[in-house]
Curated annotation (Swiss-Prot):
Gene responsible for this protein: cidA
Chief place where the protein resides: membrane
Protein family membership: Belongs to the CidA/LrgA family. CidA subfamily.
Organism: Bacillus licheniformis (strain ATCC 14580 / DSM 13 / JCM 2505 / CCUG 7422 / NBRC 12200 / NCIMB 9375 / NCTC 10341 / NRRL NRS-1264 / Gibson 46)
Function: Increases the activity of extracellular murein hydrolases possibly by mediating their export via hole formation. Inhibited by the antiholin-like proteins LrgAB. In an unstressed cell, the LrgAB products probably inhibit the function of the CidA protein. When a cell is stressed by the addition of antibiotics or by other factors in the environment, CidA possibly oligomerizes within the bacterial cell membrane, creating lesions that disrupt the proton motive force, which in turn results in loss of cell viability.
UniProt record, GO biological process: cytolysis; killing of cells of another organism; programmed cell death
Official protein name in the record: Holin-like protein CidA
Length: 128
């Protein structure tokens, strides 16, 4: 029960943070969605150890676990645009598949590059 309440508080904190980032974007007229700005700011706060991972970890893990649930309204909403899907459906699916493939390949290559650099660093520090 304690973990549930802690997770609920963390989800509320993340929600408030997201709303705050949307407000910042609106007030400052920034051409970046509030959610993207929020991700960047959360990453920076975690990276520079201004906030601790434990402060948001349980809530973030729950949100990730339930991510599919958040796409259901979007998928249902698409059904209102059957005429557009009939005309551009194949193109949309092709773009989604290609962009997914590009993201997967680039993520894999970047991960391998980072792993190699870490291994080189580890080897260099153990040789010294």
């Amino acid at each position: 029960m304690k973990t549930f309440i802690k997770g609920l508080g963390q989800v509320a904190l993340l929600f408030l943070f997201a709303r705050f980032m949307n407000l910042i974007v609106e007030v400052l007229h920034i051409n970046i969605p509030g959610s993207i700005l929020g991700i960047i700011v959360i990453f920076a706060l975690l990276h520079f150890k201004i906030i601790k991972l434990e402060w948001i970890e349980i809530g973030a893990l729950w949100l990730l676990a339930e991510l599919l649930l958040f796409f259901v309204p979007s998928a249902v909403g698409i059904m209102n645009y059957g005429d557009i899907l009939a005309e551009f459906g194949t193109s949309i699916i092709l773009v989604v598949l290609i962009s997914t493939f590009v993201v997967m390949v680039s993520t894999g290559m970047l991960t391998q590059l980072i792993a190699k650099r870490k291994e080189r660093k580890k080897t260099c520090s153990s040789d010294a």
